[in-house]
């Protein structure tokens, strides 16, 4: 009798920790902070950063919801909604994401929202589908925290373009190294005091010596491309003229190593990197972004008047979620159902914890 009671108690305990499959909806809903859910979300963030062609890396801030669908004959697919925050690391910067600082609210933070399908098979996570968008915090919210903090400025504004050109020219004139070409204008702000334009931009090294350049059009990118990142400010002097301050950091070249993909997952396309030899961002001709569509990359024109790189220009949700083998997986309209009324079943815990701050 004691053995029967013990067995019954163990069965009840197991039921408390297992995640039941909803027999009506066909999926299960684990907690948003469940370890497997978090691993799937982190795999998605890693995928996003590897495929961003410009702008800054994003980091996971919160998991909003999750559904786990069975995939036949093997594996399961996590249908996840996540919030991300922009970091201060450019996408060309090889610094590990864990070492990148989140851009603070007083610096005009940018938040991303993503719907992602992640395949878990044989203990490995692979992204099947990604749809994202991102937007800066509202001016009102920034002003509440910091009335004098500068806001993001349009990247094609003539004052921004001028500040980048002057800052890069100043750096090249004082450099003993390679002549640097502009890759993209990444971020800009109009600072009220002192009156100035603050800019951040990506660059690439060429085969020319900076101080010896006469005709920049004859300079070519290095065979093994090397990128860098610059921060500058152009301050308006009270009696006229400009005070230019700029610092640039060149990154070590990073070899691209193809990663093996589990059966049924799309092969990752190589990260699309802006071509520094192409036209620089300006008011006359905006650059183009790239959309990840399975193993291919499709060019998409960027909006002319923008202050940041919107994730939707790369992750527009056009990729298929069908696997190349096994039964196809489709996320469509699901029945509206309540929580499974299973005695001793777990309480759903979503959305998950906020890792930084909410905007």
UniProtKB/Swiss-Prot annotation:
The record marks 143-144 as: Cleavage. Phosphorylated by FAM20C in the extracellular medium. Disulfide bonds join 32-350, 89-100, 114-132, 146-149, 208-219, 230-248. Residues 276-285 have a biased composition (Low complexity). It is found in: Secreted. GO terms for molecular function: cysteine-type endopeptidase inhibitor activity; endopeptidase inhibitor activity. The modification Phosphothreonine is found at residue 314. Keywords: Disulfide bond, Glycoprotein, Mineral balance, Phosphoprotein, Repeat, Secreted, Signal. GO terms for cellular component: extracellular matrix; extracellular membrane-bounded organelle; extracellular region; extracellular space; plasma membrane; vesicle. Residues 1-18 form the signal peptide. The modification Phosphoserine is found at residues 134-135, 138, 316, 320, 323, 325. Pfam families: Cystatin. Glycans are attached at residues 99, 156, 176, 271, 280, 282, 296, 334, 341. SUPFAM superfamilies: Cystatin/monellin. Residues 27-133, 144-256 form the Cystatin fetuin-A-type domain. Liver and bone. Promotes endocytosis, possesses opsonic properties and influences the mineral phase of bone. Suggested to have lymphocyte stimulating properties, lipid binding capability and to bind thyroid hormone. PANTHER family: ALPHA-2-HS-GLYCOPROTEIN (PTHR13814:SF6), FETUIN (PTHR13814). This is Alpha-2-HS-glycoprotein. It comes from Bos taurus.
């Amino acid at each position: 009798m004691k053995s029967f009671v013990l067995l019954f108690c163990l069965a009840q305990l197991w039921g408390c920790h297992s995640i039941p499959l909803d027999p009506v909806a066909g999926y299960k809903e684990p907690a948003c902070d469940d370890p497997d859910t978090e691993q799937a979300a982190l795999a998605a963030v890693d995928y996003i950063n590897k495929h961003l062609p410009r702008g800054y890396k994003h980091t996971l801030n919160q998991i909003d919801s999750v559904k786990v669908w069975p995939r036949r004959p093997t594996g399961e697919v996590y249908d996840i909604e996540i919030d991300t925050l922009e970091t201060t690391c450019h996408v060309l910067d090889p610094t590990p994401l864990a070492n990148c600082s989140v851009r603070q609210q007083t610096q005009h933070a940018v938040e991303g929202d993503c719907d992602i399908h992640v395949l878990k098979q044989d203990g490995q996570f692979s992204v099947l589908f990604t749809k994202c968008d991102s937007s800066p915090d509202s001016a009102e919210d920034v002003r509440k925290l910091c009335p004098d903090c500068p806001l993001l400025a349009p990247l094609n504004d003539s004052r921004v373009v001028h500040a980048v050109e002057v800052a890069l020219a100043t750096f090249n004139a004082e450099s003993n190294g390679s002549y640097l070409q502009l890759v993209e204008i990444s971020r800009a702000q109009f600072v009220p005091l002192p009156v100035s334009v603050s800019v951040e931009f990506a660059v690439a090294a060429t085969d020319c010596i900076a101080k010896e350049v006469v005709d920049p059009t004859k300079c070519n990118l290095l065979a093994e491309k090397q990128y860098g990142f610059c921060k500058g400010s152009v301050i308006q002097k009270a009696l006229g003229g400009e005070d230019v301050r700029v610092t640039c950091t060149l990154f070590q070249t990073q070899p691209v190593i193809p990663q093996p993909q589990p059966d049924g997952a799309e092969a990752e396309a190589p990260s699309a990197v802006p071509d520094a030899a192409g036209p620089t961002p300006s008011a006359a001709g905006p650059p183009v972004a790239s959309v990840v569509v399975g193993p291919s990359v499709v060019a998409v024109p960027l909006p002319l008047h923008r202050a940041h790189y919107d994730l939707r220009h790369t992750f527009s949700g056009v990729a298929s979620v069908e696997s190349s083998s096994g039964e196809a997986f489709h996320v469509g309209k699901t029945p509206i159902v309540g929580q499974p009324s299973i005695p001793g079943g777990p309480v759903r815990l979503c959305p998950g914890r906020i890792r930084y701050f909410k905007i």
